[in-house]
Design a protein with these regions (language model features):
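The feature captures the beta-strand-to-loop junction immediately N-terminal to the Walker
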Residues: 50-52
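Helix-to-loop junction immediately C-terminal to a conserved catalytic motif
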Residues: 65
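Conserved ABC ATPase "signature" region
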Residues: 118-135
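Conserved ABC ATPase signature
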Residues: 139-143, 147
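Catalytic Walker B motif of ABC-type/P-loop ATPase nucleotide-binding domains
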Residues: 164-167
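Helix N-cap at the start of a conserved alpha-helix in ABC-type nucleotide-binding domains
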Residues: 175-177
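H-loop/switch region of ABC-family ATPase nucleotide-binding domains
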Residues: 199-200
Length: 248
């Protein structure tokens, strides 16, 4: 195993303030979806946003990445611009360039601040760790869905980010590939990367999460340790969700 290949460039996450939403409001289709949403997450471990489809999980991730801006309120998780530039994001829809796997990884490094003289070596490390060396020269879009998703995640990790945001990382994947990706997520977390995952899969949340944020209709109904959420949910909505009554 290659040591420390996922260790963030700035590994001093202990010095960072918690991730904070302060009175965040967001309009979708001219209607308020989030209304004065406030919460706080620490910068260690794996946090999981869970809830039914359309509950607000993906919108929250997009606010964190800066892909969308709030209509009011603040999204704060660092005043350090170097940290903000080291965010890895994998959207639910796989988006790969019409290039080889190798060139997909190089492209991400080319638009980052990664040291120029270390980019090719970084690609070799990533390919070796992910066991993708045999497909390095193949078009990324010609791979299986599972391999494409693995390339997407490794591409996000190529820059050695401090934060990794994953939106439904195992959707539509077979059990074997799901296990590979979940093991990768655990390895990356142990290296010191803060990970936030969006999912509606309660079993995946149980396996991975240190803490759970349960979304329902644009609100965070519960935010607690994983064990507490599944053993003793406080709200009717959380209980119904765990019974499979709020999946749609």
């Amino acid at each position: 195993m290659i040591k420390n290949i996922f260790k963030p460039f700035n590994n001093n996450l202990n010095s960072l303030l918690p991730i904070r939403f302060h009175n965040v409001s967001l309009k979708l289709d001219n209607n308020f979806f989030f209304k004065k949403l406030s919460f706080e997450i620490n910068t260690k471990g794996i946090s999981v946003f869970i809830g039914a489809n359309g509950a607000g999980k993906t919108s929250c991730i997009k606010l964190l990445t800066g892909l969308i801006k709030p209509d009011s309120g603040e999204v704060l998780f660092s005043t350090n611009k170097e940290i903000l530039n080291l965010i890895g994001y994998v959207p639910q829809k796989i988006i790969l360039l019409r290039r080889s796997v190798e060139k997909n990884l190089l492209h991400t490094l080319s638009i980052s601040n990664y040291p120029t003289n270390k980019k090719k070596q970084r690609v070799k490390e990533i390919l070796k760790f992910a066991k993708l060396e045999h497909v390095a020269k193949q078009s990324a879009r010609n791979l299986s869905i599972g391999q494409q998703q693995l390339v997407s995640i490794m591409r996000a990790l190529a820059i050695r980010p401090s934060f990794l945001f994953l939106d439904e990382p195992c959707a539509n994947l077979d059990p074997q590939t799901t296990q590979i990706i979940e093991n990768l997520i655990k390895t990356v977390s142990k290296a010191g990367v803060k990970i936030i995952i969006v999912t509606h899969d309660v079993f995946q949340a149980k396996r991975l999460a240190n803490d759970i944020l349960f979304f329902h209709n644009g609100k965070i109904i519960e935010h607690t340790k994983t064990k507490n959420f599944f053993k003793n949910p406080k709200s009717k909505e959380a209980k119904d969700f765990q019974k499979g009554l709020l999946l749609k």
